């Protein structure tokens, strides 16, 4: 299972040192629907997509892209899988990121925010998929861990509180405005920030050639701010969902 997920990732950095690589995965250019159409057919079991890429450089799927993916999957009898490990559980401004495109994936992968800091992962699936997952087709060393389940329930209780997501969306707008101000402070274009990226509370700054994401992260850490880099020379910003404007 671990080798399969490594093969699903298209970054050699994560696959180096592990092998042999699982076969059967085809990678397509992000957001390029024609590229996808040329590589998919009735032989494809499923399309796996991350609505907002984290490691890929805080890249949000173009408007309408997820709906096109679902249409293509339906036409070919393929499943649509939404990877919500990083963007799910409210980080997009809705409980799940796919909800903003009004689609219905067949499978959803969750982790990270699901446990609020405690290690936990989950897979949700439609009945037609779940019914096929008989004992032995899927396994987990710590599946159903009581402490992990309690942590996930606590997170869900908070996210589903009245007005929590509404307040979060207001903070997302405030956050985005502050990002704009950093790029164009007093109409002076930043010498290191090229543009903002991402969506919701998964944001990023693509940096100019003047500095690498690694160096930017090191400088930030020295000043007491922990940031993480990503593809396309991007620095990611992932504040807690309960962060206040102050």
Where are these regions (language model features)?
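Conserved N-terminal phosphate-binding loop of PLP-dependent enzymes in the Aspartate aminotransferase
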Residues: 1-246
């Amino acid at each position: 299972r671990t080798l399969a997920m490594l093969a699903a990732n298209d970054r050699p950095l994560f696959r180096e040192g592990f092998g042999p690589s699982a076969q059967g995965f085809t990678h397509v250019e992000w957001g390029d629907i024609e590229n996808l159409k040329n590589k998919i057919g009735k032989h494809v079991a499923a399309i796996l997509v991350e609505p907002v890429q984290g490691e890929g450089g805080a890249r949000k799927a173009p408007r309408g892209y997820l709906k096109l993916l679902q249409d293509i999957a339906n036409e070919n009898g393929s499943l649509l899988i939404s990877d919500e490990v990083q963007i799910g559980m409210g980080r997009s401004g809705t409980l799940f990121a796919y909800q903003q495109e009004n689609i219905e994936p067949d499978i959803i992968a969750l982790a990270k925010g699901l446990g609020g800091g405690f290690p936990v992962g989950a897979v949700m699936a439609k009945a037609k998929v779940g019914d096929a997952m008989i004992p032995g087709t899927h396994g987990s060393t710590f599946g159903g861990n009581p402490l992990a389940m309690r942590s996930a329930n606590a997170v869900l209780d908070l996210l589903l509180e009245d007005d929590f997501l509404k307040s979060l969306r207001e903070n997302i707008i405030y956050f985005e405005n502050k990002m704009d101000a950093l790029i164009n402070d007093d109409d002076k274009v930043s010498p290191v920030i090229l543009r903002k990226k991402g969506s919701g509370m998964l944001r990023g700054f693509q940096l100019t050639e003047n500095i690498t994401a690694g160096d930017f992260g090191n400088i930030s850490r020295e000043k007491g701010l922990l940031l993480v880099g990503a593809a396309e020379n991007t620095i990611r910003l992932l504040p807690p969902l309960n962060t206040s404007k102050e």
